[in-house]
Amino acid sequence: MKLTPMMRQYFEIKENYKDCILFFRLGDFYEMFFEDAETAARELELVLTGRDCGLEKRAPMCGIPFHASNSYIGRLVAKGYKVAICEQVEDPKVAKGIVKRDVIKVITPGTYTDSSFVEETKNNYIMTIYSDLERNRCSLAITDISTGDFLATEGELEKGVILDEISKFNPKEIILLDSLDQELIKDITLTTPALISRKPIEYFEEKFEEVLNAQFGEKSNSLSLMVKKSSNALVKYILDTQKISLTNINDIEVYSLVDFMTIDLSSRRNLELTENLREKSKKGSLLWVLDKTETSMGSRMLRRWIEEPLVNKEKITLRLNAVEELFNDLSLNDSLKEALHDIYDIERILGKISNKNANAKDLIALKTSIGKIPNVKGIIENCTSSLLRNYHHNLDDLRDIYELLEKSIKEDPSLTLKDGDLIKDGFNSEIDELRLAKTNGKDWISSLENREREFTGIKSLKVGFNKVFGYYIEISKANYSSIPEGRYIRKQTLANAERFITPELKEIEEKLLGASEKLCSLEYDIFLDIRNEVENHIDRLKTTAKIIAELDCISNLAFVALENDFIKPEINEDGETKIENGRHPVVEKVIPKGEFIPNDTIINKDDNQLLIITGPNMAGKSTYMRQVAIITLMCQIGSFVPASKANISVVDKIFTRIGASDDLAGGKSTFMVEMWEVSNILKNATENSLVLLDEVGRGTSTYDGLSIAWSVIEYICKNKNLRCKTLFATHYHELTKLEGEIHGVRNYSVAVKEVDNNIIFLRKIIEGGADQSYGIEVAKLAGIPDDVINRAKEILEKLEMESSKDNLDLALKEVNASKEEMKEASITSSYEVKETLVEEDKIEIKEEVISKASEAKTHKEDDQIQLDFSAIGKDNLIKELSEVDILSLNPMEAMNRLYALVKEAKNLI
């Protein structure tokens, strides 16, 4: 059997879109067949039917009305599918044979622009990644076709670099070079929910000069070869999916990875910059506190500022000075916010214009927005800060575009472009003439209706119109007997009425419909001319939109600073950060006003380089550490900060190792994840970085963990290529002995007050280490049963009585002394990387850290030694006692070993 002609056409088109669900236009429906139909029926809850296709079995089929397609497309795209829209590209009335069809657009998660599914305040990015294995380099290109943003960068081909950029932009779709390392592809897949496609090297490397010149013109000539190749693939992908060149993508913003603060994936999550950890929503994040912007453009820009803090002191100062000027003039800033409030999303309107799907209401929104610009410009006219002066100077009032739209487009135009009612009277003489003819025709229809009522005596007689039957005379069945015989021609019978026509009515109908059809067609053509004229000025419009967005951010930061009692920080590059009465901006927002306890911080590259913070759980150690990082970050985006005074040293990177989590999909345990994060920090932090380490080593045995934590502290403080500012929270109180032993280490703790065997968390950071962890008290607060609490106290008392704290102190001193005897050269020399297998996965830990940790713990086999004192005398007992490795034992093992030794010693007396 042979396929039907229509089904042959379907398969020919589907062959080129195998990775898409093909929406195949048949009349007023989009139909899907075979596997596409089965997938769509399942995902969209549609009825699966069948259609004869020429084969023995009917083709599985389902369909949706074309006029309601957007919601169905959005649901599929949200689930990670690509949808190819196949339209009839010729009029069925004039088609010879089967109607020609072709795919006019491919809609993907990264190219979908429908406002019902794309968040107003978020960019919808798509990313390409290119790699050169020989040079060990990679390049990335990123765009949001709805706004016209197009960015690119290049750097070392390292997993961390790529994953950090992915976490920063959070793209909905990623196109990879198919020869990219498989392990890296796996890591990318586990890191992001983005739809991932793979393309051959030719897709990146062929015709890049031609493609980029066509899209960007001479601007592309100065790009590096690496950037050209990733950008080439991205532009090609846009052309492949949109089927047109998008004029709003007309420039490439090439940025360097060192232009902005590096914040790795883990740190973005831990600091909850744009979404909270628990619900992945904006509420409870830093963005939630800071975002009181007036425009969608400003909100997206602020999000990007938070994701990309500045590292250039001069640029930070420019923003801070602009914020300060508006902060100091409340009336001025209120006026500015009011003027910005009525400005629509110019960037996304331009995206619609570029994509040829902007309607008349979009142009009215654009006109309204442009009309606000002179007021905005006037408000900041007398501002003195450099940034605000630049905004005023460069802000284009776009008067010519405003006047064009003001005189051409109706204030309340039709949503459907081909239905007319778009163009104002007086703009085009031919439109005015056709409207007059149409109006006269309607007057005639009204006159006819009155005349027929008088003639028949039927007061309810009316003349109506629909697209199927045209004009008609409708008479209710109750008045049917009053119709003069032979006056009307019956056209349609309804349940309660009859519809008729007359030769005279059909004659005027032809004239009216001819005028209406011609009017709609002419209005549509003129509208397209106006839209194209606006598109010719897209460069000016994009520049203006960016200034409005930045101005909104500056105004917003001034407003938020006033609302939350933030202060302007000072900036330095000396390496010392001083914060007086610092507060966590999110935490203080969610607890009753006035209850947050502020804290001071001094951290530098000298005597306060690494702060060891001890204290019980729930006391506020993690909040304090995060607050220092967030205050630093806020300063570097140009924001005022929550403190009474702050002098912030610019940092190039923020790293955090906070909280316990595993990576089951990646096959990594909690401890494995912790070690990977620590390894990443030790390899990538610099002397200008800020590092937060919380409970390093807690995922393993006590002395393993203590040894690792100790050696990490030494490595950070003694490696002359590192010495980064570090906040180190721990429950290993033994580490507090490092103050005075290692230069730069200082002890701090969270103050706790004991009242009637209960503890009160004072949330205050004070100098000196904590003397205990209060773990049982915290367990009691958490609601652990009293029986468990009481038994825990008994066990703790026995352990504390029988443990030999003095011996432990001595051991710690001896281990430290052995380290001090090491030559300084070995401390400051270049550190080699050693690969260590941990739980069947690989972690790279600096060899120096491994060797230092090993000093505090002997080989595991020693733990298994069974002492048989029945065969030895006192000398042997002393010898065996001296060989017991106390550092390798957990508290219970130490107690059992001590008990056995004491018992045997008594037998020898």
UniProtKB/Swiss-Prot annotation:
Keywords: ATP-binding, DNA damage, DNA repair, DNA-binding, Nucleotide-binding. GO terms for cellular component: cytosol. GO terms for biological process: mismatch repair. GO terms for molecular function: ATP binding; ATP-dependent DNA damage sensor activity; damaged DNA binding; mismatched DNA binding. The keyword Hydrolase does not apply. SMART domains: MUTSac (SM00534), MUTSd (SM00533). Belongs to the DNA mismatch repair MutS family. This is DNA mismatch repair protein MutS. It comes from Clostridium perfringens (strain 13 / Type A). The lineage of its organism: Bacteria, Bacillati, Bacillota, Clostridia, Eubacteriales.
